[in-house]
């Protein structure tokens, strides 16, 4: 089957056609021809879409799906359909399933179940057994089975020595270690950003300091051990500064930010809407501005949806009792496109995350695999619960 894309603006800094409007013929999964105009003849489907833009396929590095164990939240099949509909050709699935993705067989199960689907699935395996932070999981075996990185989703590694050993051990096979930026002792039982709003609303606060201390610890360890460290979903201005300074020292550290942390503040909590209860918590306008600048400066490498669907029974309750998490795949592009330059978004969703996580990126050139995302940067829509797959 062949498809002809008419008048598509190519956004791909690795392509010789970057920022050019071209016709693109795709045949048998590969880009057969790119030209100013390709005649609309032959046995292929012609797509003429308003303000069509294309880029290398989007890759989301932090997606939670409910299978196995929490299928009431989202099944693997449904989650992959949502990703494809939202423009993502690849996703990395977090280890917070039940049982936890902490073994070779668990990694293989997910890869086999997602085989031959529209969206590629890459497991991020647990760093520790059952994500309890007590004993390192069999990292090498899981890497050989297809795991692309190792981290306990939203669970910080409290044991300093265990984190040190993980960073050292992973170097034997060029493994990427993830460390969630939160110090549990400082965070305590907090459920919202510590500040004026949490005080006014009577909500227990989580100081940004809890994030800073954990990041500082991990950077000290990384400086000692070497290796590669990725810090997922940072949320505060000081975190940007810490990581930027570490990069200047030459440390192999990267980080991501969730799309919602680029646009939403803790002012949203005045409605006590539990859909805004996230980990890390929504922070301040000053933090948002620093995060946006961090993307522009290169201190922040990746934008993720941090998609984490929660069933209504655990969301439609009192704010203090609700589980953290929100759906993000469907809205990530629309949200971030309102506050960032298009090329910054594309870079942080394509070339940068693929390079960091070791996924091949296919430039938009003739002969390459057609791993592409289609979008309209000027399109508008209102996302409602009726749109949820």
Across the structure, where does each feature detected by a protein language model lie?
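Short, surface-exposed loop/helix-turn segments at secondary-structure junctions
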Residues: 276, 319-320, 381-389
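Divalent metal-coordination and catalytic microenvironments
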Residues: 8, 29, 51, 62, ...
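A glycine-rich helix N-cap at a beta->alpha junction
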Residues: 113-127
């Amino acid at each position: 089957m062949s498809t002809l894309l008419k008048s598509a603006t190519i956004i791909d800094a690795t392509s010789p056609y970057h920022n050019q409007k071209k016709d693109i013929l795709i045949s048998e999964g590969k880009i057969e021809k790119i030209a100013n105009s390709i005649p609309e003849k032959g046995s292929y489907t012609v797509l003429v879409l308003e303000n069509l833009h294309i880029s290398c396929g989007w890759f989301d590095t932090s997606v939670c799906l409910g299978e196995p164990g929490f299928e009431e939240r989202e099944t693997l099949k449904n989650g992959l359909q949502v990703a494809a509909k939202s423009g993502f050709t690849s996703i990395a699935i977090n280890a917070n399933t039940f049982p936890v993705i902490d073994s070779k067989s668990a990694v293989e199960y997910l890869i086999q179940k997602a085989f031959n689907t529209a969206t590629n699935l890459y497991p991020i395996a647990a760093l520790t057994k059952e994500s309890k932070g007590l004993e390192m999981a069999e990292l090498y075996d899981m890497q050989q089975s297809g795991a692309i990185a190792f981290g306990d989703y939203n669970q910080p590694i409290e044991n300093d020595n265990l984190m040190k050993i993980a960073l050292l051990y992973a170097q034997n096979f060029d493994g990427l270690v993830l460390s969630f930026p939160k110090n549990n002792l400082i965070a305590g039982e907090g459920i919202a950003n510590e500040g004026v709003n949490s005080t006014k609303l009577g909500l227990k606060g989580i100081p940004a300091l809890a994030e800073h201390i954990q990041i500082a610890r991990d950077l000290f360890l990384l400086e000692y051990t070497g290796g590669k460290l990725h810090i997922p979903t940072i949320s505060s201005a000081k975190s940007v500064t810490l990581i930027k300074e570490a990069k200047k020292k030459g440390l192999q550290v990267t980080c991501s930010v969730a799309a919602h942390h680029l646009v939403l503040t803790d002012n949203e909590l005045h409605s006590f809407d539990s859909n805004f209860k996230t980990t890390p918590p929504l922070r301040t306008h000053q933090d948002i501005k620093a995060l946006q600048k961090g993307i522009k400066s290169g201190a922040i490498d990746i934008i993720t949806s941090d998609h984490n669907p929660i069933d209504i029974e655990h969301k439609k309750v009192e704010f203090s009792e609700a589980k953290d998490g929100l759906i993000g795949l469907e809205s990530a592009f629309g949200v971030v496109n309102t506050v960032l330059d298009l090329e910054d978004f594309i870079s942080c969703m394509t070339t940068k995350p693929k390079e960091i996580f070791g996924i091949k990126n296919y430039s938009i050139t003739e002969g390459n695999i057609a791993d592409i995302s289609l979008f309209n940067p000027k399109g508008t829509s209102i996302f409602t619960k009726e749109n949820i797959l």
